[in-house]
């Protein structure tokens, strides 16, 4: 954990010795590249990629989209239900990469419960470390390129950073203590 690797090393050089049943979560501040890294890692290793952010953005539920547009987190029970549904469809034996969950202490417990009921456990938590300044630059660039509405409002961006600092970043200690945390220089 003390050694910080680049995400290119993790994706391109690191071979996962036993892919069967590998469950990986990707965490990091807004704009750190969670979606990009998740997709590359899943593609390289034949894993299923589950992005809770994409699930919400593609949802027909306008209330969920309004919550995101304000920079708030979706309620834990809704996120857990969405993840449980997607994991139920995934090929767990081939491995899964999850980005966007967990984001709260309660969600870590929910994730443990969901995985336990499916007969698998979490193998790694990859933390994409990136400064707030660089994250903000990436978010604004993404807003311009992809037209993501939730990336265009500076107040919403600040709220997302605050939510991350207060609710999500503290989760890293749990995964560090369980020796599942891999820190990546994003």
What feature does the model see in each segment?
Residues 1-186:
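Glycine-rich phosphate-binding loop of ATP-dependent small-molecule kinases
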